[in-house]
Amino acid sequence: LRSRGLGDVYKRQQVADIKIESNIFVPKYMNIDYGDMGVLFGNLLDNAIEANQGVDRKKRWINVSVKYEEHILIINIKNSKIRGSRRKKKGYLNHGIGLNSVKQIVEKFNGIVEVQDFGEMYEVSAILYGICDDKDLGKSVL
């Protein structure tokens, strides 16, 4: 279970020389715990950075898209990877717990997580339902 700050993820991305593009359109306030958001994005971005490790430095990239539409939060992260690779962390007893943590958080909002391997690209999509924005906080939206 990773709950490191996104600043740590940013530092890892810089050291790994990965180009990141992001399109993030969300309200300032939402009914998602900050700790859950840290675990959600920390794990997804850590996985994307890890998948880039074997890729030629000039071909490393991550694309992050997050948008909010009518009580739905849509997260999409795509990243480069080596075709056919399925990295395993040597000596890491809890490998795989990160994505399970992501799924648990998404399930709190009756959402879904989908992971797809397109050869030289991974894509992870998560949809969370019943998200309140700053105009709706305190109201039931389900």
Q: Can you name each region flagged by the protein language model?
A:
Residues 104-142:
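Flexible, glycine-/charge-rich segments associated with ATP-binding catalytic modules
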Residues 1-10:
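Single conserved hydrophobic/aromatic residue that forms the stacking wall/gate
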Residues 21-40:
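Conserved short strand/loop->alpha-helix "switch" segment adjacent to the catalytic nucleotide/phosphoryl-transfer site
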Residues 71-100, 135-141:
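Glycine-rich/acidic phosphate-handling loop/turn and adjacent ATP-lid/helix
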Residues 22-28, 68-70, 79-81, 117:
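Heptad-repeat coiled-coil segments of the DHp/HisKA dimerization-phosphoacceptor module
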Residues 59-71:
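Short beta-strand/loop element within the Bergerat-fold HATPase_c
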Residues 34-57:
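Conserved ATP-binding N-box helix of the HATPase_c
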Residues 13-21:
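Short conserved segments within the C-terminal catalytic ATPase subdomain
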